[in-house]
Swiss-Prot record:
Belongs to the protein kinase superfamily. CMGC Ser/Thr protein kinase family. CDC2/CDKX subfamily. It comes from Oryza sativa subsp. japonica. Its EC number is 2.7.11.22, 2.7.11.23. It comes from the Eukaryota. GO terms for molecular function: ATP binding; cyclin-dependent protein serine/threonine kinase activity; protein serine kinase activity; protein serine/threonine kinase activity; RNA polymerase II CTD heptapeptide repeat kinase activity. GO terms for biological process: intracellular signal transduction. Residues 4-283 form the Protein kinase domain. The keyword Transferase applies. The modification Phosphoserine is found at residue 151. Induction: Down-regulated by cytokinin. This is Cyclin-dependent kinase F-3. The gene is CDKF-3. The active site is at 125 (proton acceptor). InterPro entries: Kinase-like_dom_sf, MAP_kinase, Prot_kinase_dom, Ser/Thr_kinase_AS. GO terms for cellular component: cytoplasm; nucleus.
Length: 433
């Protein structure tokens, strides 16, 4: 260790102290973690979970272990240097993060986590302090509590900082899964919006209360297995209805709220994996934005070959209203990726926005009602089954979670949408399937 000169201490944890130092031979700045316990055999050192995990994990969003050395029964880990951690970034923040900034943080966290889980490890101690940041790059650190996914239970019950601890751990489950990491990710995502913890419990019992105060007290219909865990009787003291997350996180979008709700599900089996989370609509940027736009906001879109047109007439009734509901023009692309907005009447075209930079979209169809644009729309019933990002007749619907082809759909788009005349209601915008 003679070649490393300590600059200052930057962290003090349960297992060790962390110092910023530089290599006197190369002048490279590094982070040195000095373990608190004594080691007498080299075999003890290389058998540590943190060493074994970091030897196997090599990813841009996982901190790099450069060297392990032992002197006078003291063990030192030499890591790449990072400027700060996410806790420092949140604490020093004067204004809320933009959604773009939050999305950038979360993509990196989930990418590192997906790699870790796919390579047989789960972290068990995800929290802002263990997410290191340099120039917008985020890396997962501190694998002292990491376990192999294939390892056999029982696991220790005291893992992760309390505020980010999954309920199955609080209830002393001995056979939890990588889903405990996903709970922590949900809590961190919420904190990035509010700059304060979502579940700031003062004790383990208070932590359960704080979770119930947000999610509502679970029962056998919400989390059957959880009701049989050792400490599940604690719920008898907390009979609380769920809160509306829009009230707690007013600056979050519908997609962000939905992702938080799924990640922070009582039942760990309902939480998406890291890979599934990356496919959530919250991360679907550069795609179309389904909301009404004024003509001045309409984007100019590159001209492409004309699409094939089909006129579909469904079973008409005898009343004029039946014809009004059932006559629809269907446009199907002549090839995948067709952009047909240039052939749309101006009053319809102003209702949509396609991002020119979005490449390789799925084959889509658009539907327009063949009725006069000045026909009154106030009496038309709103569709109840659209996903949360859709806007019907200029009004955003409440989230009916799910996008077609996504693992996040409680109810995907109706496959028989046009077999039922009640769903053929004209919509004052273009909808893509």
């Amino acid at each position: 260790m003679e070649r490393y000169k300590v600059i200052r201490e930057i962290g003090d944890g349960t297992c060790g102290n962390v110092f910023r130092a530089y290599n006197t031979e190369t002048n490279e700045i590094v982070a040195v973690k000095k373990m608190k316990r004594k080691f007498f055999q080299w075999e003890e050192c290389i058998s540590l979970r943190e060493v074994k995990a970091l030897q196997k994990l090599n990813h841009p969003n996982i901190v790099k272990l450069k060297e392990v050395t032992m002197e006078n029964h003291e063990l030192f880990f030499i890591f790449e240097n990072m400027e700060c951690n996410l806790y420092d970034v949140i604490r020093e923040r004067q204004a809320a993060f933009s959604e773009e900034e939050i999305r950038n943080f979360m993509v990196q966290i989930l990418q590192g986590l997906a790699y870790m889980h796919n390579n047989g490890y789960f972290h068990r101690d995800l929290k802002p302090e263990n997410l290191l940041v340099t120039d917008g790059t985020v890396k997962i650190a501190d694998f002292g509590l990491a376990r192999e996914v294939s390892s056999s239970p029982p696991y220790t019950d005291y893992v992760s900082t309390r505020w980010y601890r999954a309920p199955e751990v609080l209830l002393q489950s001995s056979a939890y899964t990588p889903a405990i990491d996903m709970w922590a990710v949900g809590a961190i995502l919420a904190e990035l919006f509010t700059l304060s913890p979502l579940f700031p419990g003062g004790s383990e019992t208070d932590q359960l209360y704080k979770i119930c105060a947000v999610l509502g007290t679970p029962d056998h219909t919400v989390w059957p297995e959880g009701m049989n865990l050792p400490r599940s009787s604690s719920f008898n003291f907390f009979q609380i209805p769920p809160r509306n997350l829009w009230e707690l996180i007013p600056n979050a979008t519908l997609e962000a709220i939905d992702l938080i709700q799924q990640l922070c599900s009582w039942d760990p089996r309902r939480r998406p994996t890291a890979e599934q989370s990356l496919q959530h609509p919250f991360f679907n940027v550069g795609n179309w934005v389904p909301r009404p736009l004024h003509a001045s906001h309409t984007k100019t879109i590159e001209t492409r070959p004309n699409p094939r047109l089909e006129l579909n007439l469904w079973d008409f009734g005898t009343e004029p209203e039946d014809n009004y509901l059932d006559l629809t023009l269907s446009l199907k692309p002549s090839f995948p990726g067709t952009d047909f907005s240039n052939n749309v009447p101006e009053h319809t075209k102003e209702e949509i926005l396609l991002y020119p930079g979005f490449e390789n979209p799925p084959v889509q169809s658009g539907f327009w009602p063949l009725v006069a644009s000045d026909r009154p729309m106030g009496d038309v019933p709103a569709m109840s089954s659209w996903p949360q990002a859709y806007v019907v007749d200029g009004q955003a619907t409440l989230p009916a979670v799910g996008f077609s082809g996504s693992p996040f759909g409680l109810s995907p788009l109706q496959p028989n949408l046009f077999e039922n005349r009640s769903f053929a209601t004209p919509i004052r915008q273009v909808n893509f399937f």
